[in-house]
């Protein structure tokens, strides 16, 4: 049975061929203006598409909600809510509308949408000016709230009747679906906060994500982006911020039937030290799971048996060890290096390698002596503390995967300095050193040498566990090995899949319990999860 939304509207499809841009509020408004002025849309048609998208998502995401209360402000966000209310009512839902302004105070397009409401629904609208004891009775039995009070044009703080409404629904059990943004949020927010905003269980935004959608932590529920008719040419961003999720498309093309392991690359994981044999083993296993054709772990002789026992599919290469059991500079002999590189496509250097001075010297010289694509992580990065100038990606492909502490050591600064402006930190280092830099943490960033930065929106606190970084290192190396001509997409895809596997884990188990290797059990699920379904792009799946 088709819902009223589908009967009444042929919703537009996405027109994006490249990465989805992340916009500021001003850029979003300019996009809407270009869509109207240059592509022949009307403001009313954009509002119709937006409201229809919200109603469609509400029907699919909250199918058991019968009594739906739609909370509308006087601006365009309220107009989107009025359109959604009309379609939900047409789909058989019991809809109640609360207006935070008198009908005659509505702006022009929202007023037009108000006039389109069926007479019975329009006549039952509750107009809220200030606290009203009748409101509680009006909202009794609500199964779902649609928050359409304030959108991208709002600037905190929130005042007036909206504050009372926020406080009223804060203690109610019914979920809240936010239209564009939870009311009270600034669309340009780049830090997590919840002060003063409506609670939210899901968010539907339009055309492209805004800064708050990727950096704000608006909800633990899903965040989706719906098309409303703006073509790609209308979406212009000066911030050069994109989203990692669209790079997942490189994994959606089936492998050729006549494929062989040689077509998918050979990864050499260089790492390990006494007590840290698990790190290169996990990276190697992750590289295999992520699709590399062959994987070899190059580790000190003393831990080779431990590493080799981790997975039967993994090959090992024994390296000469120092007096303390780490990797020795003896392995830098030209013949040894040439033998190590034979048949290898991508290097992953650093997992469990330790911080012994001799091993750090090995890492620096090894990277200087080789020209293969290389992924550097953990103590492979710490080896360049005080030597960051030697990390030069000109003439070869280098991917660095630091957490904030490792990034601070490379820069000779502090974690607080790194975290103060993560985007600028990542972008500046990537462009200066001609590397691809994966700055891990809340909303992991992938910064490219050309200045573009992709923001990742998958992942959750289950990843705050030793070994998850080693898994990511192996996945990044495997993706680069499989897609050597599409390195930017390969790295972004690996980061997205890493987080998506953790999201898949917590859908059935608790985030406290995940082991790093359990990520790999959910990797197939992450690969098969479509970026776009039900007519919307899933920026965040929710937990």
Protein language model features and the residues they cover:
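A structural motif corresponding to the C-terminal end of an alpha-helix
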Residues: 121, 171-174, 432-435
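Small-residue (G/A/S/T)-rich helix-start motifs and N-terminal tracts that mark the onset
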Residues: 14-102, 107, 202, 211-374, ...
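Short coil-to-helix leader/linker segments, especially the first N-terminal amphipathic alpha-helix
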Residues: 10, 113-129, 235-250
């Amino acid at each position: 049975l088709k819902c009223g939304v589908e009967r009444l509207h042929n919703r537009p499809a996405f027109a994006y061929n490249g990465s989805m841009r992340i916009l500021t509020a001003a850029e979003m408004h300019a996009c809407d203006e270009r869509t109207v002025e240059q592509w022949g849309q009307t403001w009313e048609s954009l509002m119709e598409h937006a409201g229809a998208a919200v109603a469609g998502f509400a029907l699919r995401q909250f199918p058991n909600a019968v009594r739906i209360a739609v909370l509308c402000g006087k601006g365009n966000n309220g107009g989107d809510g009025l359109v959604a209310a009309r379609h939900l009512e047409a789909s058989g839902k019991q809809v109640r509308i609360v207006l935070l302004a008198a009908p005659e105070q509505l702006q022009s397009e929202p007023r037009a949408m108000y006039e389109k409401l069926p007479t019975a629904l329009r006549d039952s609208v509750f107009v809220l000016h200030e606290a009203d004891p009748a409101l509680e009775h009006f909202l009794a039995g609500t199964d779902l709230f649609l928050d359409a009070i304030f959108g991208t044009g709002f600037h905190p703080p929130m005042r007036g009747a909206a504050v009372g409404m926020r406080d009223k629904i804060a203690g109610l059990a019914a979920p809240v679906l936010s239209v564009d943004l939870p009311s009270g949020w600034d669309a340009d927010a780049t830090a997590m906060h919840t002060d003063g905003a409506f609670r939210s269980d899901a968010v539907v935004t339009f055309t492209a994500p805004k800064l708050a959608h990727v950096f704000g932590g608006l909800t633990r529920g899903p965040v989706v982006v719906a098309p409303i008719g703006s073509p790609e040419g209308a979406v212009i961003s000066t911030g050069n911020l994109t989203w990692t999720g669209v790079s997942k498309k490189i994994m959606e093309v089936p492998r050729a039937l006549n494929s062989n392991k040689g077509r998918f690359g050979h990864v050499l994981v260089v790492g390990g030290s006494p007590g840290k044999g698990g790190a290169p083993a996990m990276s190697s296993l992750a590289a295999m799971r992520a699709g590399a054709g062959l994987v070899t772990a190059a580790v000190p002789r003393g831990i080779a048996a431990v590493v080799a026992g981790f997975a039967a599919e993994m090959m090992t290469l024994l390296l000469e060890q120092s007096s303390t059991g780490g990797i020795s500079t003896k392995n830098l002999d030209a013949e040894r290096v040439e033998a190590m590189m034979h048949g290898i496509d991508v290097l992953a250097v650093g997992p469990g390698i330790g911080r012994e001075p001799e091993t750090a010297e090995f890492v620096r010289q090894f990277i200087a002596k080789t020209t293969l694509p290389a992924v550097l992580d953990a103590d492979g990065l710490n080896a360049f503390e005080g030597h960051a100038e030697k990390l030069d990606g000109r003439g070869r492909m280098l991917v660095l995967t630091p957490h904030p502490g490792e990034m601070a050591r490379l820069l000779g600064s502090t974690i607080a300095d790194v975290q103060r402006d993560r985007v600028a930190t990542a972008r500046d280092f990537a462009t200066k050193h001609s590397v691809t830099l994966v700055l891990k943490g809340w909303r992991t960033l992938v910064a490219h040498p050309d200045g573009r930065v992709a923001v990742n929106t998958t992942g959750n606190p289950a990843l705050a566990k030793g070994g998850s970084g080693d898994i990511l290192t192996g996945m990044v190396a495997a993706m680069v090995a499989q897609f050597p001509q599409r390195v930017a997409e390969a790295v972004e895809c690996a980061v997205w899949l890493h987080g998506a596997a953790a999201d898949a884990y917590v859908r059935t188990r608790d985030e406290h319990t995940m082991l790093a290797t359990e990520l790999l059990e959910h990797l197939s699920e992450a690969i098969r999860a479509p970026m776009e379904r039900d007519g919307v792009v899933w920026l965040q799946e929710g937990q």
